[in-house]
């Protein structure tokens, strides 16, 4: 079985992290976002993953080719010369996707959840129509594509992209199974699968919804990235508690790479992820943060709701909070306060940032 993952976007919502690394390769809980998806697909029996690539495609290709042998699957690249939306990439990869008559997965690359891929396959085969969409319930459906479907069968009657008035609280979770017949509906041009393809399929009775059980998050922007981390760590607590870290000063759900080092008298957690090579000196307090590979947090600093990029250096007695995001290789000097700062890569910060703003 095959899967197509849409990884061609610029990742603008997750800047400044995506200025130096394509979004699918940004580490989420110590593993690239894309790898969470690919490993789950491989575990469900997918043997060929196609990546619809554009921005920083060489970095993506290099990283995923290295994973091919480890996972025992085939990984192909489908290169977009121009942005093709969310349906155009299917037409571009038509030859690969239609090599067999089997249905195939399509995934948005921003999504993290428990990935019920085997259950999706069973659901799709049971109803026998052209398309299956994974849906989830949210409190603010107006930001998403909303699905109106039959409660017992899942047959979708309407598919409304970002409705202005309340239609339903079930939204498109960004994961589909489609039969090859769907490819005949899509032309090789910029096309939205949500606005142009799914509404027609729903009208013809060819689209069904399966409701996701468990957590779900679109982690495409920093505040949602941190919320997704909290949900993921709680899921680990329930299913794989042995993967979480415990020890002096550890509070709640904390994930620590074995190569990270934590000093004395620290308070780490709840909801913290420390990546490979991270150094946390004595007396540091970190809550609800992701600290990426080779970052260094010096003594007595206090971080809450932050993303610290690769190889950053945070000085002594620094306070950072309110979804402060440091791009790659940022230096924050001693005794500064950063409130909601978004700092571009390779910057050195010499004065406090008391109000949320972008540091260029």
Curated annotation (Swiss-Prot):
Regulation of its function: Enzyme activity is reduced by incorporation into the GMPPA-GMPPB mannose-1-phosphate guanylyltransferase complex. Allosterically inhibited, when part of the GMPPA-GMPPB complex, by GDP-alpha-D-mannose binding to GMPPA.
Positions of region (Substrate-binding domain): 2-222
Active site (UniProt): 162
GO molecular function: GTP binding; mannose-1-phosphate guanylyltransferase (GTP) activity; metal ion binding
Gene Ontology BP terms: GDP-mannose biosynthetic process; GDP-mannose biosynthetic process from mannose
Gene Ontology CC: one annotated term: cytoplasm
Hexapeptide repeat domain as annotated region, ranges: 245-360
Keyword check for Methyltransferase: no
Main localization, broad class: cytoplasm
Location(s), subcellular: Cytoplasm
Keywords: Cytoplasm, GTP-binding, Magnesium, Metal-binding, Nucleotide-binding, Nucleotidyltransferase, Transferase
SUPFAM superfamilies: Nucleotide-diphospho-sugar transferases (SSF53448)
Binding residue positions for GDP-alpha-D-mannose: 110, 218
Keyword Membrane annotated: no
Catalytic reactions on record: alpha-D-mannose 1-phosphate + GTP + H(+) = GDP-alpha-D-mannose + diphosphate
EC number: 2.7.7.13
Cofactor(s) needed by this chain: Mg(2+)
Stored Pfam families: GMPPB_C, NTP_transferase
Pathway: Nucleotide-sugar biosynthesis; GDP-alpha-D-mannose biosynthesis; GDP-alpha-D-mannose from alpha-D-mannose 1-phosphate (GTP route): step 1/1
Function of the molecule: Catalytic subunit of the GMPPA-GMPPB mannose-1-phosphate guanylyltransferase complex. Catalyzes the formation of GDP-mannose, an essential precursor of glycan moieties of glycoproteins and glycolipids. Can catalyze the reverse reaction in vitro. Together with GMPPA regulates GDP-alpha-D-mannose levels.
Domain characteristics, as noted in the entry: The N-terminal substrate-binding domain adopts a Rossman-like fold and has a binding pocket for GTP or GDP-alpha-D-mannose. Substrate binding is coordinated by an Mg(2+) ion. The C-terminal domain consists of a series of tandem hexapeptide repeats that adopt a beta-helix conformation. The beta-helix forms several protein interaction surfaces involved in assembly of the GMPPA-GMPPB mannose-1-phosphate guanylyltransferase complex.
Family per record: Belongs to the transferase hexapeptide repeat family.
Quaternary structure, from the entry: Component of the GMPPA-GMPPB mannose-1-phosphate guanylyltransferase complex composed of 4 GMPPA subunits and 8 GMPPB subunits; the complex is organized into three layers, a central layer made up of 2 GMPPA dimers sandwiched between two layers each made up of 2 GMPPB dimers. GMPPB catalytic activity is reduced when part of the complex and binding of GDP-alpha-D-Mannose by GMPPA induces allosteric feedback inhibition of GMPPB.
Listed name of the protein: Mannose-1-phosphate guanylyltransferase catalytic subunit beta
The organism's taxonomic lineage, starting at the top: Eukaryota, Metazoa, Chordata, Craniata, Vertebrata
Gene, per the UniProt record: Gmppb
